Amino acid sequence: EQYPFLKSHVIDGKAVLPMAVMIEWMAHGAIHNNPGLRFHGFNDLRVLKGVTLEHGQSHTLQVMTGKSFKSGGVHVVPVELSGVAANGKQFVHCRARIVLAAKLPEGKVAMERVELQAYSRPIEEVYQPDRLFHGPDFHGIREVIGCSADGIASMVRPAPLPTDWIKQPLRNSWLSDPLALDSSFQLMILWSFERYKSASLPVFAGRYRQYLERFPESGAEIRIRVTNQSASKAAAEIDFVDPGSGALIARI
């Protein structure tokens, strides 16, 4: 009840904490212990054990931060999202090195869309059990611009206010945009179905850099270039682009 967004992220009858929300909470932990710095991104984020909840179940999570260190003009904070097992032992759900900066650098030039063909489904059929499991809170994809063996592109909605998803949020505004980030992972699922007839779920992100303190309120364009692929896994570069100015908002 405290986290109503979880009702829209259910797999096999269990609520699953989205990786995009893990990112938000870990970034908040890093910022909280390093006041005055801004969230710039992360390195080497890996989900080791997903956070799942059955109906009526609760689970205690802790964000653990290490000592920050400077590297290449930014501040790097080791962060872990941990839980407690039934035997009382603590274990790690997710870890990353959160990157903070005194001032966000100017964004790079956004990559061009890869060559795309028309997507095979109308947008009304994207959020169906045979494609995307996501409920209403995570219906972030407005339009699939196109899809091909090399990638996919889409227009996505912005996240609502944190209070729409969480009864007592840690902040009154997002550090990133969890709906935009989650939508990029959704697009990889759609791409995987088109290419290999199966879904892919995110477990690792090597590098994320954000060049604006906040995502545009109008939403974003997502451009994905698949760099490595097989029937069992795929790797991609993902750009979040301001559809109005063409500026690069963020890059995975």
Model-derived features: positions:
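Acyl-thioester-processing domains in fatty-acid/polyketide/NRPS systems
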Residues: 1-252
